Amino acid sequence: MKKMIFAAILATVSAVSMAEGTNGHFTGFGVGAELGATDWSDGGRTVADVNAVGSYGFAFPGTELVGQADVKYNFGNGRVYSDNGVSIKARNTFSVGYAQGYRVTPNIMPYAKVSYVSTDLKASSGGLFGSSRVHGVGVGVGAKMAVDSNVELGAEYQHARLSNSDFDGHLKTNSLNVGAAIRF
């Protein structure tokens, strides 16, 4: 997993060094917010998402390709599992991702994305408590639309598989989010 994260960071750094400065929509620094839902398939629960997003987009010279690196933090504290007195909540969820997009028009950009996702699961049963951080890789697709020179709207779907060394198996999540961002 550490090798995958290192490779993703190295690829992003090399892509940024090859990219030209900000030109057109979807480039430059951006901050925004997302609302959506995440379905935890192993727990059978759907949890509401409220995400803060920071990103940096850059254009590739002579093409309509746009790369975007982003960081997301989920403010939710949702219950992802509840059965027979056992309750598990997901909290402190964050992701670091890279999206490769293509401007099909000057104002519309579909993209594919890969992310590192990490969340803290807190379990309680009666008077017993425990927590474990799970992490993994998410893949997704989305689209953004520039409604003004500095404002963009977007929608994104992501599937992630999360695990850790103490957990046998994978937790699977499916997220659908819509959001707005301001670019600088």
Residue ranges of model-derived segments:
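Gram-negative outer-membrane beta-barrel domains
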Residues: 17-184
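Gram-negative bacterial Sec-dependent N-terminal signal peptides
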Residues: 1-19
